[in-house]
Amino acid sequence: MTKAGISFDEMKEDMLKDEEFRIEYEKLKPRYEAIEQIIRARKEQNMTQSELAKRVGTQKSNISRLESGNYNPSLDFLAKVAESLGKNLSVTLN
């Protein structure tokens, strides 16, 4: 547990115990995995949402919506986020 409360991983594990939630999560799994990677990369760099937004050239509210899953970003936007985090964007079709 972190100082701020329950960790993302703990929260996700707890929520996945609910069958209805788990089914919906599986449908949205690629989106949640991307969000999780973005949040993890940002936190590993001790970067705030505001700092990431500045690097990306967008508003903090867009980063907040992205991280909360309330935003359907373009590939170009995701590429900017990845680059701002020192990462590469990779898309795979299975």
Annotate each PLM feature.
Residues 38, 52-53, 63-66:
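Conserved hydrophobic/aromatic packing and binding residues within compact polymer-binding modules
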Residues 37-51:
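Short basic helix-loop element that most often maps to the first helix and adjoining turn
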Residues 67, 93:
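DNA major-groove recognition helix of helix-turn-helix
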Residues 46, 57, 68-69, 86:
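Central "turn" residue of the DNA-binding helix-turn-helix
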Residues 76-91:
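DNA major-groove recognition helix of helix-turn-helix/homeodomain DNA-binding modules
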Residues 43, 54, 83:
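Alpha-helical residues within the helix-turn-helix
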Residues 1-36:
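N-terminal flexible/basic segments that precede or flank functional cores
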